[in-house]
Swiss-Prot record:
Enzyme class label: oxidoreductase
Function: Cytochrome P450 monooxygenase; part of the gene cluster that mediates the biosynthesis of astellolides, drimane-type sesquiterpene esters that show antimicrobial, anti-inflammatory, and anti-tumor activities. The first step in astellolide biosynthesis is performed by the sesquiterpene cyclase astC that catalyzes the formation of drimanyl pyrophosphate from farnesyl pyrophosphate. Drimanyl pyrophosphate is then dephosphorylated by the sesquiterpene phosphatase astI to produce drimanyl monophosphate which is further dephosphorylated to drim-8-ene-11-ol by atsK.
UniProt record, GO biological process: terpenoid biosynthetic process
Name the record gives this protein: Cytochrome P450 monooxygenase astJ
GO MF, one example: iron ion binding
Mutant lacking the gene: phenotype: Impairs the production of trihydroxy confertifolin and deacetyl astellolides A and B.
Keyword DNA-binding recorded: no
Induction per the UniProt record: Expression is regulated by the secondary metabolite regulator cclA.
Keyword Iron: yes
Encoding gene (name): astJ
Amino acid sequence: MSRRFPIQVAQSEIPPIAWGLWRMVYRLWLHPLSGYPGPRLAAVSNLPYFAWTCTGNLHLRLQELHKVYGDVIRIRPNALTYRTPEAWTDIYGHRKPGTLPFSKDPEFFMPAQAGSSHMINANEKDHTRQKRLLNHAFSERSLRQQEHLIMGYIDLFIQRLRGQARMGAETVNMEEWLNFLTFDIIGDLAFGEPFGCLQNSEYHPWVATIFKSIKTGAILRALNIYPILLGFIRRFLPKSLVQKRIAHYQMSKDRVTRRLQTETSRPDFISYILKYNDDRGMSTPEIEMNAALLIQAGSETTATVLAACLYFLQKNAACHRRLVQDIRSAFTQETDINFLSAAQLPYMNGVIEESLRLFPPAPGIGPRVVPKGGARICGRYVPGGVSVSVGHYSTFRSARNFTRPNEFLPQRWLDRDAESEFASDQTMALQPFSYGPRACIGRNLAYAEMRTILAKILWHFDVQLDERSADWANSKSYIVWEKGPLWLKLHPRNVPQETD
């Protein structure tokens, strides 16, 4: 199906300048999306979107445009973005029987190679098949089985931070240490072996490779709208960037191969895949691709939200005091903190939800393509072939969805009665893990980790934000955030320590 609407004039019959003028006129006044509001330049050219993406400001630009143009804006000649709760359901939700799904936009999500797709870029049929297997690995039952393993890494994390304090470190880069922790956890869950980041107090080469390639990957993805230019630029990319991408998948392949050759009763992801695999299961290349995906999706994003929690708590002293009091009142000893008990603290949950709202791990868009025949989105018909999306940052920080949208107010998630200041909040607008059948499969794991890690940090340490990180949240985004160091002063509490 063509992604571009036909212009009923043959380009070869018109001089280039006239053709360009005709295309501009068509896109402004004759195109099926000509009735949608947005910047005129974005209606006739992809260049504004490309510039917003490459400068890391797409999330901010969408927020500004929604303030000017309303709930739906035309951000490219053939693309719309929304900020309403209804748009989540209409674009990303489960489809009614007999209706076609909104497929992932191939100009944003790199199409899968034959036989080697993963959960994000797989087509609908392959995604359903892969999800059937991975659901077992992320079920509540498997989470309970994995808890002991995960808690071991969290305890090591706390020990290492206490060790930093004993050695006289005035501040620690918590953004880095949280990444050490979450990468070690996901490495063990995905492959049955950690990366050793916590033990060595440094990134494993594979982890370092992932971080170095994120920004480049985002820019190359934006270039998909200019295929000829993309092909030209690829020829001049430094070989090191190409080699890093190859190395990422080769490391995943090597670890998967090693794990498949190892018999173990430990409850890692591959053990569940192997247990339930059959003729309709995953091929080895698909296991390798999904393992590589899980390493990034299951680590960096969780660390980002935890860093945001600590940052916003430090910027809002009353919120920090309340959560610390809740945690230290609820748990008289460290061993009381576990997945179940940490989930019972309402204010803790509010802090996490509010951090997800203000600093979503993926602040931009995840576009879909309207199926052939078109569909109704927010009560209005949209033709087939149009790219549509909901912007995370722009939706979560919109005054049409949330009272005092740019303030850190965890109580908004607790005070839900009719008399509350937040009674009119559109809580369904907050979908940081996306929505519908292709929402993030690791949501339960992420929440369990975030609650427990945050509780352990604030139970063990008095925390203070270093002035070097006063503007930490003012970051650029390239699919995920390009974060700077989060420097915190940690003062260990005098509490009994468990012995190994």
